[in-house]
C-alpha cells in the first residue's frame, strides 16, 4: 500500500505509519480481521500493492497505539496489558491483542479494549466492538 501525504503533515507522522510494527504473529487471522467483511479482506489482499491511503487516514490508529503504550504503565499482578493471545478453531489459528485484562480472582477476568475515536462513533451501536470483545473472551477462556 502506498502512503500519501496530501495535507502536508509532518514527515515524522508518515514514517510512524510506514514503520508500524503490528503483527498478528503466527496466526492465520486476527480478531479484527475475522470480524471484518470477508469481501473487503479479499479485495484488500488482491489489490494491496495498488492501494493508496493518506497519512491523515491513520491518525486515529496512531492515537490508539499511543494509548496502548501508555496503558502498559498500569501493568501489575492484577492487570495484564497488551497481551497477544492465540487460539485454534476449526484448524485456523486466531490471535488477538487485548489492551487490558483485569484479574478479578483466579477464574474471572474483565477484558477492556480502549477505543480512541470521535464522538460520532458512540452515537450508534457498534456491534463490531461487541464481537471483538466476545472473541477476546473466547481466547481468554481457551488459554
Report the location of each language-model feature.
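An active-site-proximal "capping" alpha-helix that borders the catalytic cofactor pocket
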Residues: 129-141
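Hydrophobic/aromatic-lined pockets within catalytic cores
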Residues: 116-119, 138-142
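Metal-dependent nuclease catalytic cores that hydrolyze phosphodiester bonds in DNA/RNA
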Residues: 1-111, 118-131
Amino acid at each position: 500500500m502506498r502512503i500519501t501525504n496530501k495535507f502536508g503533515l509532518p514527515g515524522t507522522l508518515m514514517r510512524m505509519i510506514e514503520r508500524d510494527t503490528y503483527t498478528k504473529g503466527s496466526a492465520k487471522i486476527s480478531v479484527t480481521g475475522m470480524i471484518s467483511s470477508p469481501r473487503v479482506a479479499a479485495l484488500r489482499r488482491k489489490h494491496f500493492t495498488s492501494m493508496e491511503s493518506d497519512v491523515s487516514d491513520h491518525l486515529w490508529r496512531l492515537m490508539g497505539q499511543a494509548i496502548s503504550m501508555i496503558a502498559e504503565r498500569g501493568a501489575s499482578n492484577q492487570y495484564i496489558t497488551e497481551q497477544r493471545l492465540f487460539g485454534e478453531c476449526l484448524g485456523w489459528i486466531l490471535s488477538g491483542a487485548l489492551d487490558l485484562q483485569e484479574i478479578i480472582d483466579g477464574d474471572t477476568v474483565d477484558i477492556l479494549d480502549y477505543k480512541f475515536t470521535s464522538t460520532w462513533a458512540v452515537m450508534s451501536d457498534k456491534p463490531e466492538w461487541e464481537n471483538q470483545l466476545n472473541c477476546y473472551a473466547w481466547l481468554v477462556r481457551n488459554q
